[in-house]
Curated annotation (Swiss-Prot):
The gene is ILL4. PANTHER family: IAA-AMINO ACID HYDROLASE ILR1-LIKE 3, PEPTIDASE M20 FAMILY MEMBER. It comes from Oryza sativa subsp. japonica. This is IAA-amino acid hydrolase ILR1-like 4. GO terms for molecular function: IAA-Ala conjugate hydrolase activity. One of its GO terms (biological process) is auxin metabolic process. Pfam families: M20_dimer (PF07687), Peptidase_M20 (PF01546).
Length: 414
């Protein structure tokens, strides 16, 4: 591995002409956030920038996605993929700054604007160094991370020839200039469920003439809590949370039915499948015990469950070594496992993958006139990005790809 490549790429990304372009890209995208599978303006911006760079691409992929290819001129080799998600969230931005969202009720509150901007600058860095690497780099500008867009990209076959894939996500718990991840399970698999428990409505003064679905639903909610407490390994994270419940409209009427729903999470995809099976069994069983019937729906057609994001050990070690060479060992951390979910898990199921957090915690250099150095959570209307992190992410993408391609083209182990 080159001991200087990462630092050279970072220096290039921090150069005034690069850094200004990078900030401008992120701010333009930030002002016009688009929801899942509606990223038409963002997709057009990506294609225009790729055209200007002379980078070939395929479009549309999964409705609004773009997959570009930078081919190394040093000879044949593996295919390495880099991915950035493009969608925003249905949140009203409450940060007052010059480049605030212009779209009512929509905001890039998860940093996907930064992801797209960093990958575009990585494309320029890669294009300018084509003579220095073998193989190909595919740049995946993916729609709808919040709508399983990664699953739909894979279905189209554009990554069938890819040997490995890498992506980053902004991390508010890390300062700019710091990156973090971990080997093995990193982010949880997730799914949602809804259930309808049906009994027999009647007068609340005569419960013996009714079949009460509220009692059945209450028993089901309590029993669901025992799945994690008594059936899962305490060293392997899992969550079952009932977050909605609705039944009845009047004080003196036992309703005909009750609906409830929630989310489930597991640090393994097998664990997620186990939770799904047990949730169905528990709800149906508690309904039957209370003389009711139940219909449980995991909404897999509309809200496809996300597999856990599991970092390939070799790819994690490779990306970590690149980061340490570029930023210094003190600025590369081992992150804890996180119950958040990411559709990058679909890629990691199919292709050896690594997923890293890029610190965007503000040190007063957010670049947008926001001097309050607060650390806001993802999905917050107050979310901000320290733009000093953007060149780090751009250079990290390019360095991870180039180093991997050259190591593997020369026959050495990744």
């Amino acid at each position: 591995m080159s001991t200087t490549l990462g630092r050279e790429l970072l220096e290039a990304a921090r150069a005034p002409e690069f850094a200004g372009w990078l900030r401008g890209l992120r701010r333009r995208i930030h002002q016009h956030p688009e929801l899942a599978f509606q990223e038409h303006r963002t997709s057009a911006l990506v294609r225009a920038e790729l055209d200007a760079l002379g980078v070939a691409y395929v479009w549309p992929i999964a409705q609004t996605g773009v997959v570009a290819t930078v081919a190394g001129a040093a000879g044949p080799g593996p295919v390495f993929a880099l991915r950035a998600d493009m969608d925003a969230l249905p949140i009203q931005e409450m940060v007052e700054w010059e480049f605030k969202s212009l779209e009512d009720g929509k905001m890039h509150a998860c940093g996907h604007d930064a992801h797209v901007a960093m990958l575009l600058v990585a494309a320029k860095l890669l294009q300018s160094r084509r003579d220095h690497f073998n193989g190909k780099v595919k740049l995946v500008f993916q729609p709808a991370e919040g709508g399983a867009g990664g699953y739909h990209v894979l279905k189209e076959g554009v990554l069938d020839d890819t040997q490995t894939i890498f992506a980053v996500h902004v991390a508010t718990d890390l300062p700019a200039g710091v990156v973090g991840s971990r080997p093995g399970p990193f982010l949880a698999g997730s799914a949602r469920f809804t259930a309808t428990i049906t009994g027999k409505g009647g007068h609340a003064a005569e419960p013996h003439l009714a079949v009460d679905p509220i009692v059945a639903a209450s028993s089901a909610v309590l029993s669901l809590q025992q799945i994690v407490a008594r059936e899962t390994n305490p060293l392997q994270g899992a969550v079952v949370s009932v977050t909605t419940i609705k039944g009845g409209e009047a004080f003196n009427v036992i309703p005909e039915s009750v609906t409830l729903g929630g989310t489930l999470r597991s640090m393994t995809t097998d664990g997620l499948s186990y939770l799904m099976n047990r949730i169905r069994e528990v709800i149906e069983g508690q309904a039957a015990v209370n003389r009711c019937t139940a219909a449980v729906d995991f909404m897999e057609d509309k809200l496809r469950p996300y597999p856990a994001t599991v970092n390939d050990e070799g790819m994690y070690a490779h990306a970590k070594a690149v980061a340490e060479s570029m930023l210094g060992e003190a600025n590369v951390t081992v992150s804890p496992m996180c119950m958040g979910a990411e559709d990058f898990g679909f890629y990691a199921q199919r292709i050896p993958a690594a997923f890293f957090g890029i610190g965007v915690g503000s040190n007063g250099n957010d670049g947008g006139g926001m001097a309050e150095t607060t650390k806001n959570q993802l999905h917050s209307p107050h979310f901000v990005v320290d733009e000093e992190a953007l060149p780090v992410g751009a250079a990290f993408h390019a360095a991870v790809a180039i180093e991997y391609l050259n190591k593997n083209a020369s026959g050495r182990s990744a």
